[in-house]
Amino acid sequence: MKLTRLAIAALLALAPMAHASDLISFWDTPQHGGNSFNQAVPDEAYFRALKATGATWVRLTPSKWKGAGRDFLIGDADHYTGIPPSDLATLITCLDAAQAAGIKVVLVPLSLPGDRWSQQNGDKQDDRLWNDKAYWDQSAAFWHDLALALKDHPALAGYNLINEPTPEKGMDLDEHADAATRQAWYAKYKGTTHDLPAFYEQVIAAVRSVDPTTPVMVDGGWYANAWSFSYWPTKLSDDKVLYAFHMYEPYEATSSPNLKRDPQLRYPGATSWLAGQNVTWDKTVVADYLAKPFEWAAAHGVPNNRMVDAEFGCVRQWVDCGAYLNDVLDTLNAHHAHWAFYGFREDGWDAMDYELAPSVTQGQFYYLQEQGKADQLKRTPHPLMDVIEAHMK
């Protein structure tokens, strides 16, 4: 059902109206937070628990929540016609809970029209958004409607327009290519449906037509690869943009399949293919790798306080997860960057719940979740969370 302006106005009455005149100032100093990718709608207790870690913000996706249609908020990613009012009401209730807990929210959808999240699409890549600009128009319409509905909510600190876009996928660009290769690729595809900066310009214009103040966060391409901004010839035209990247490299070591290796890939010491050569990962390589987005920012007049590592992490049962987290966080804090760890008390996946005690097995996690006894999960000691909290101070 299409959300009319009258319906939006009625729902806005549910949200507090006090709103900062210039929200970008929140991001003038380093902000540290966590990701919320839960299937259940987080409540105030959840946000208070996150705030207790030292977090000041949460990167929140509502895309896993059950909605009125197939795709929460969008209704149907095959054809967007308006935000279902009941979905919007649920989201506003969640934002109210975050506000009550004193934590700021950046909203991020996992799906857009023509780009349904693969885990809700039979594990199949949906790349219609990057092949048909009709879906650009629908995505802009969606964000116009959402910004119109939420622009005055005091919990909001930003709109992250899409999580981990992949306009380069299947288009002859290696995910780990060097800057020159990426730039040559973009020169070929600039102005096409694979032009991510142009897509963002269109969507931001739609947002700004109704909301001139809420910051916009944009992920780089290739799943927000930290090197993806290297092909952007300029920063975006809007002056309230945060540029986001994610950090899971070397993925072969930080991800779940490594737990099945005997022996596990270690850190430092794991190797991977990067920019045409095999590298051995240690703190120096982490620092060099993460320097790339900041080098791009400096070259294009973007200050470090507009750069965000919006996701990073490693599976908690990896023997070297703590050492890896420490080196990533040392590097990010040296740049005075914003960051958000992945993830906080995710209810459908235990692998990056750093509060869980090392003794908690995957089987115990899923059993207690299924029995509705998640509150019985042992959350101390939590040496990995200690690493994260130490870097928040």
Where are these regions (language model features)?
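Active-site mouth of glycoside hydrolases
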Residues: 21-215, 220-230, 240, 348, ...
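Gram-negative bacterial Sec-dependent N-terminal signal peptides
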Residues: 2-19
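A non-catalytic, amphipathic alpha-helix used as a structural packing/dimerization or gating element
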Residues: 53, 138-141, 288, 292, ...
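Short, hinge-like loop/turn segments at secondary-structure boundaries
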Residues: 76-77, 123-126, 176-177, 233-237, ...
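Glycoside hydrolase catalytic-domain groove-lining segments
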Residues: 193-198, 202-205, 213-217, 221-315, ...
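Aromatic-rich peripheral "rim/lid" segments of glycoside hydrolase catalytic domains that contact
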Residues: 319-393
